[in-house]
Amino acid sequence: MPLALIPHPYPLTPHPLTPITRLETMNPATIQLYLDHGIDLRREKLEIALCAQHNNGGLAGTHWWESTNLRHLFPVGEVNGSHGVARPGGSALNAGQVGAFRAAEYIAHRYADWSLDVEATTQLAQQRVTELTHWCELAKQSNIDWQSDRHAMQRRMSRCGSAIRSLPELEAAVSETAQQYERLLREGVSFTDHRGQIEALRNRQLTFAALTCLQAIRFAVQSGVGSRGSAIVLDPNGVALHEQLDETWRIAPENADFRDKVLVTQCKVSNRYPSGNVALQGDRNQDQATHYYEPCRPIPDSDLWFETAWAAHREGQIYET
């Protein structure tokens, strides 16, 4: 087909389109918005910020979005580990919406009957509330407030667990985060009101998640995955990232052998502190989790006929698989 007949939203030009040219075509109102605030995008460089939105991963789940190791837990949406390195944004939104609907269907057909031991659950809940209450009382005496503790963890994650990674930085970050988490369990972080108490409890969860994530990233780098997705791995023996960048910016190239594999991380716990808090297992330089790669689940090769598939749906057989 001649190029002139292909619908195209951009001006046809023999030269590559610049960002401002694309913006003039796609969303000229944005240019005017900046002009209204004294910024001319045609003349001034625009500072950009980088976020780790596509640092994908999540809880392992079945094709019905049920956790593979915690029955009756349904991690739906971007908390699910089905979001891969190169997934498009539309599929992520679709997975959340369709996943919630499918999970609700599965729950209605498989878990409609009451299965909770109320007495045992109440006893466990009371024990946990007692533990957390003790921790919160302990935390009031801490000389570190929850805001400072949170910021230290966030800065470390942005520096080591985002788009630019290196093994030496990750080694240090894992050790620092393990120390932070152990101190957090022993001493807590101070707060001044009920909202601060909630945030202090969030610090426990966030720091544990940060530690587990950093350990998983370190394992991936050690395994030789290389630079892929939304992260580059700095390597002095790697390839030059760009001719205008110095030797600091040499990166480990992607190892394509990992494209059909998924990294699985399983957390371990050992003893508890007197307050009931879970302690890390072993030395802080060792993972409190195990990591391994397994093959991605293949897309099923199905030759179902409509009549049989519809019958299986009507009779509820689909919820048995």
Predicted segments — roles?
Residues 33-37, 102-110, 135, 156:
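Generic, well-ordered alpha-helical scaffold segments in large soluble proteins
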Residues 24, 28, 94-98, 147, ...:
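Electropositive phosphate-/nucleotide-binding environments in soluble metabolic enzymes
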Residues 1-87, 170-321:
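Mobile, glycine/GP-rich and aromatic-enriched active-site lid/loop segments adjacent to catalytic centers
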Residues 82-107:
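A conserved FAD-binding loop/helix module that cradles the flavin
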Residues 112-195:
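Long, amphipathic alpha-helical stalk/connector segments used for oligomerization, subunit docking
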Residues 66-68, 109-114:
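Secondary-structure transition/capping motifs at alpha-helix termini
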